[in-house]
Amino acid sequence: MAVSARSARSPPDSDKVQKDKAGQTSGRRQGSRMGKLLGFEWTDVSSWGKLVTLLNRPTDPASLAVFRFLFGLMMVLDIPQERGLSSLDRRYLDGLEVCRFPLLDALQPLPLDWMYLVYTIMFLGALGMMLGLRYRISCVLFLLPYWYVFLLDKTSWNNHSYLYGLLAFQLTFMDANRYWSVDGLLSARKRNAHVPLWNYAVLRGQIFIVYFIAGVKKLDADWVEGYSMEYLSRHWLFSPFKFVLSEEMTSLLVVHWCGLLLDLSAGFLLFFDASRSIGLLFVSYFHCMNSQLFSIGMFPYVMLASSPLFCSPEWPRKLVAHCPKRLQELLPLRTAPQPSASCVYKRSRAKGGQKPGLRHRLGAAFTLLYLLEQLFLPYSHFLTQGYNNWTNGLYGYSWDMMVHSRSHQHVKITYRDGRTGELGYLNPGVFTQSRRWKDHADMLKQYATCLSRLLPKYNVTEPQIYFDIWVSINDRFQQRIFDPRVDIVQATWSPFQRTPWLQPLLMDLSPWRTKLQEIKSSLDNHTEVVFIADFPGLHLENFVSEDLGNTSIQLLQGEVTVELVAEQKNQTLQEGEKMQLPAGEYHKVYTMSPSPSCYMYIYVNTTELALEQDLAYLQELKEKVENGSETEPLPPELQPLLEGEVKGGPEPTPLVQTFLRRQQRLQEIERRRNAPFHERLLRFLLRKLYVFRRSFLMTCISLRNLVLGRPSLEQLAQEVTYANLRPFEPVGEPSPSNTDSSNPNPSEPNADAVHSEF
């Protein structure tokens, strides 16, 4: 990956050093159009030897050091939060019966106290990386635990977590401690020394690939047509655009098209000197918005920290030069960097040029091979076909960010006793701490295998496991993603072969989305609709809740037969026909046509509607009494409407209690919405303080256990209770959400089936 012209050159003082030692200037390069545009001449890449010399050109270390410091700081902040140190005991509690999803089944978590030690090593490595203290060792101390934790749980994989591991891997081989580091204070050889150009080239190439491949993946028809993030435009951040655009056009033009153009162009805008200021403005605005739109941890800030890598490497020195002199004494050096053995210096023809050594050739080879590998991996799914589902590959290294949104309407897990034939149902997600397994065949296979090991403890022998999972991707019909007739315990799965029990995504039905949106918009606010598509030969068994007093099914395409189980009646529906479904009963919908059937459930939650009407009446009555238009005195059971709480007297009705709880909740939301900035900031900081406080205390407890042994259970319980305290938060504040908020204690497997109403 090349660098821009200004980025490739050293600062003025550094140029002087090179001229004194090498006896040549870069005047010719400055005069060449290619040199000005790309930072190198064609002759610099005309042979392997010249390319090695180019990639090892001495470059100012200042910008690289600033990125090292900021990236290390982001990782220090990330470990207690998104890496899960604050909730580690909930995820890896010893003896917890839970199904896990590592990349390799042989990869298992260590005992809890040892997991805290792993995280401690990772934290110290990130801290050492940030400070540039024993830099190479610190990078390794961070890198190895990070990838161990990352590979331990596929359900937590995402693009930015993968990117962190890549950046740490790159920094391990770089000389990022040659400026603004503790190592530089301890070693004169490392203090303010040149770094080879490939250090910048690899990082810039990585960030360029992230932007550009993300843009290429957004050329998907769903993104271009505005289906991927359809509801994102409702966020308050897009309010300014709605002064001139409708919400639909804001979603299409601003969210989707502008997002596509930004990803495709960001790398180029940052690369070239003439457009860099515009690129910095756009990507900074983009990542600041993302920090508010999504819960993606440190990712926006890491990307913000990476943007200055595209600027001239000496920009920190220029910044320091504009600071007050007293402050300059505390800031990094402004003097020109000293020569380094890691670089190749050009000399005069009389003296002969410096010949690149093995380390220089290895650095150049690493740069080329690494960037080629990063360009290949997002399109390598033809090799790992077992991980392909409706989208290609495990979510992470493909850079297909936000392209696919899913909704799950119905999930049913059925088990059959292999000896007795007895059928039973499991709560979806039992024995798990994540929901991502529903979309990935490899995780489903791991989940079924785990359940087959756990169910014999509950008197289910030789269990067979069947999954009926309905998913809608990017506003399509809800449809099955896996064949519900296949026992996943015995089903074959290979990482290198297509999954035979994966159902195809019904792409032929995608044009229906416009019609489906028209149907939705034609319904009133109290009517809900769910669109279903099913395969020939399969049927859907569903239960209509008693709360849904007005439920009907209407056929859109194909032919279905509806069986009312309790009444033992069948009715066949042709296209356009509909029928009423009784509440509180099961029914089955069989697809009879040779092609997939499409139908929709239309229903009204009559119980919820009646409650809303009653609450609206109480609100109206309260307002009438307060403004004096209601002359009749309120009965005693309704007095809490005026007081806002129960103060003696008769017990209010459940309806009044529900009204009071809603009023209190609305008042709290309004109070928070109108809270001054300093109050919001304080609440945010206190929640973060709790996360770091709990992380620190639980780590101390575990390290003590490893060194001195575990105390009594009573003492441990007291220590954990103390770690869970929130002494800094005001009374009544809700608990902050943890990294993993799922229930660590799964339900019993013989619980009643959970039926999701359509």
Swiss-Prot record:
Per the record, ranges on the Lumenal side are: 82-113, 158-292, 383-758
Q: Where is this region: Disordered?
A: 1-31, 727-758
Residue stretches spanning the membrane: 61-81, 114-134, 137-157, 293-313, 362-382
| Any single GO BP term | vitamin K metabolic process
* Record-given protein name: Vitamin K-dependent gamma-carboxylase
Its membrane topology, per UniProt? Multi-pass membrane protein
Compositional bias annotation for Low complexity: 734-750
- Tell me which parts of the chain lie in the Cytoplasmic compartment: 2-60, 135-136, 314-361
